[in-house]
Amino acid sequence: YTFWPTFWPATLAGISYKEAWYDVDKMVDATREAMHLLDPDSFSPLIFSFGPVMEALGYKAMYWPGKGVGDNVTFQYLDDEYVSADEYDDYLFDPTGFYLKSYLPKIATAFEGFANMPRLPSLSEWRFFASLSAFADPKLQESMKQLMESGEKMAEILSAGGKFIGE
């Protein structure tokens, strides 16, 4: 069977779900302990310590341990309308543009500046060059900074997971 480590290793190791969600080293240790106990055929290499990333993103589509729910409560998706019925035509016309400019700004503050992103696909490089002025928008620049911070935090988590896989 394939072991998919989420919160059970935290319980086994005696750490809170919040600790598991925010401290990748503790979660790696907990996952290692669970792997030795269960001896699965395979396992998911992803270590679920996304708290710092979700904080940096300003993620709004879920609660997680220590943020919206208790320290020993699993994450909970928030039932909200992220795509309204009158937006389906926009989505069908330009799925990528809709995702970047409409959907993502609704689920994370780091993407709010993307609402003002230009439409980059063009057959003319002149239109593309002119559209680059949108990147001077302070909101879009702030979004880029938040995303860089989020990316750095995710790289740390993936690095810790990669070291664990290499053991």
What are these regions (language model features)?
Residues Y1-E167:
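Catalytic cores of TIM-barrel enzymes
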